[in-house]
Amino acid sequence: MRWTLLSEHPEEIARGAVFQFPARWPYEETVEFMLAELPPGADDRMGLIVTTGHKAGLWVVSLPDEAYAAGRPWALSASWLRDNWTAKVHVETDLEKILVCTDYSPSQQHG
């Protein structure tokens, strides 16, 4: 599992990617959001869901058509996310502290 700064991430970010960043109430000190595909028939195609803490499982935002990478209906544009994160996703985020993991796997810490 490898984390990359969003500011240095290549152009496409596919569903299943996880974003980790420092946060505060209503989240914990660090929160993770996963890029998830919406079910068929939904108005939008993808969005972000909280995967950690007491807000885990809650939907954060559906992403607009302009968020997608050109010609890639199930991948987001990293540059769109960088340009729109504070307006569309989480206003209180330092963009230089957002990490992205595209090969997220279960924790190896379970006994």
PLM feature spans:
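Short, solvent-exposed secondary-structure boundary/capping segments
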Residues: 42-51
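Short beta-strand-centered aromatic/proline hotspots
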Residues: 27-41
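Short beta-strand element of the conserved SAM-dependent methyltransferase core
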Residues: 19, 35, 47-48, 58-60
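Intrinsically disordered, low-complexity, charged/polar segments
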Residues: 52-111
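Mixed-charge, Lys/Arg-rich low-complexity intrinsically disordered regions
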Residues: 1-14
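Tryptophan-anchored aromatic micro-motifs
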Residues: 15-24
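Glycine-centered tight beta-turn/hairpin loop motif at sheet-sheet or coil-to-beta transitions
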Residues: 24-28, 54-56
